[in-house]
Amino acid sequence: MAPNNQLGKRVKLTQVRRPFIVGTTAVPFSETNPRPVGAPDNHTHSWSVFVKGLEDTDITYWLRRVQFKLHESIPNHVRMIEGEAGKPFMVTETGWGEFDITVKLYYVNESGEKPQTLYHYLRLHPFGRTEEEKQAMITKNGEVRAWSYEEQLFNEPYEAFFNILTSGQGKKSTDAAAPARRQ
């Protein structure tokens, strides 16, 4: 006989997808993006790495924390970011080089799921096969974006987590008064 589980039974033959974006943005230091006080002289860019919902929807109802493991040369290179409703999970730094960032996703306790690990490459400079592809990565303010669409697939979630996933949560973070959107 299976042990008693506080999360309920698994919802058989069910898959629930939750889309999100993992990405980096980088901006070279300039008059419009000045070097922060205390940043080393050899640093050339400010950059951010983040995990957020599509169209800035809130994902904290299913994702409770994200761990970003940065390059070992960065002080406090393992950063644990707790979820705040309506805000992306984000780390902002300065630097001069590109590197792989390990991104570990921790789900809400009701999920009963183990953490998931992803990898994302910090891009400070545009890349592509053609000049058009490179220019497509740069915004008007000179920001280089390297964003990836991801989907988290929950196979046969526990009943408690299934109810959370299908409750219609996921409001846009820019409009807290808007009605909840079904995901």
Model-derived features with residue positions:
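Long, charged low-complexity regulatory segments
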Residues: 2-15, 21, 108-183
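A structural supersecondary motif
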Residues: 7-39
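Compact, well-ordered interaction domains used in eukaryotic information-processing assemblies
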Residues: 29-142, 146
